[in-house]
């Protein structure tokens, strides 16, 4: 029954309508029994006493004719004489339930308040209870002795048309309400069903089909955010495919080269050529090893929940150590390094920060022209540390857009695997910092870390 949200909402709403109708009936019944019964009893008793007074003063003859006339005025009347003989006027009572003791009391001159004293019944409205005990009664004096007269309004006749009207009204109310509930439930569920179908498409790898935003409420917001999520997942999937292709290419190329060198090594007899092959194989294995290390580091950065950032890093010392370690690169290209480093500390992950600054410094040395200068500065302003590294030469605008993409290379001939700057950016972002590139006559990388 509740396998779909549509049936669940529709059944809940219909249940609420029916339950509300039932509770309304019960509370109305309670209200009648505890607030209206007494006043209803008093009004009918007053009418009956006025009828008795009229009969006493005007002496309409005979009494039977007078009571028949009252019966024709939509009253139900029962009379009982001292011998127990009963006569009925107007519509017939459904049940004759009045007790003999009540009849005797009325014959003895006591008033009978059966309407007011009618016992409360949970699912029965006493107002419509067509029984002789649900009446008021008084004593009439006749030439033949005392006569007990019991009377109640003929509700069935008085409200017959109204009851039909009320029944039609309630029936139409329920039919229209339930129909509208079903229709409105469908309008609510329709976009949810569309979302469900869209998630099924995404599970099957279809990220290209959007869903139409049809509303401006919470469901409309959900539709909008779902489309955003779909686009992001599509981008992630494209990046994943691109990443797998690049990794496959980066691994396949050196392996193919190694296979060729092994074949060449097996066939050559020249010792010098053999040594060249071996040296080249060592170089290729080192490249593959570096690629593996950087891929593992990227995986670590993508799942950074286990990383800690509590090291008190002396940035001045860290940068100087990198420059000293890479001194051979400056000697090879006759580079001149100008450094201006403030004595600054930063709380973070020292291993990762060393990797980030190392990548930036090595890149600057690697792509700087022969006999050129590299400027490195480390300064601080209001709650901000700024690292700036600048070398001669420029990067094309199209290349600059993708410089931080994984596996992006400025040149196919480059020995780089295109992961260094992507790793650097990830590390800086994990430290809640930023890294930007500007390039015109010179190329400049700017790292900002918040203290």
Swiss-Prot record:
Root EC class: transferase
Ranges for domain HAMP: 186-238
Catalytic reaction list: ATP + protein L-histidine = ADP + protein N-phospho-L-histidine
Domain of life per record: Bacteria
Entry comment on modification after translation: Autophosphorylated.
UniProt GO molecular function: ATP binding; phosphorelay sensor kinase activity
Xref: SUPFAM superfamilies: ATPase domain of HSP90 chaperone/DNA topoisomerase II/histidine kinase (SSF55874), HAMP domain-like (SSF158472), Homodimeric domain of signal transducing histidine kinase (SSF47384)
Histidine kinase domain span: 246-451
CDD domains: HAMP (cd06225), HATPase (cd00075), HisKA (cd00082)
Transmembrane regions listed in the UniProt entry: 9-29, 164-184
InterPro entries on file: Bact_Sensor_His_Kinase (IPR050398), HAMP_dom (IPR003660), HATPase_C_sf (IPR036890), His_kinase_dom (IPR005467), HisK_dim/P_dom (IPR003661), HisK_dim/P_sf (IPR036097)
EC nos: 2.7.13.3
One family name in Pfam for this protein: HATPase_c
Subcellular location, record wording: Cell membrane
GO cellular component, one term: plasma membrane
Entry-annotated residues carrying Phosphohistidine: 249
Keyword annotations from UniProtKB, A to Z: ATP-binding, Cell membrane, Kinase, Membrane, Nucleotide-binding, Phosphoprotein, Transferase, Transmembrane, Transmembrane helix, Two-component regulatory system, Virulence
Membrane topology: Multi-pass membrane protein
Function: Member of the two-component regulatory system HssS/HssR involved in intracellular heme homeostasis and tempering of staphylococcal virulence. HssS functions as a heme sensor histidine kinase which is autophosphorylated at a histidine residue and transfers its phosphate group to an aspartate residue of HssR. HssR/HssS activates the expression of HrtAB, an efflux pump, in response to extracellular heme, hemin, hemoglobin or blood.
PANTHER family referenced in this protein's UniProt entry, alphabetically: HISTIDINE KINASE (PTHR45528:SF11), SENSOR HISTIDINE KINASE CPXA (PTHR45528)
Protein name per the record: Heme sensor protein HssS
Lineage: Bacteria, Bacillati, Bacillota, Bacilli, Bacillales
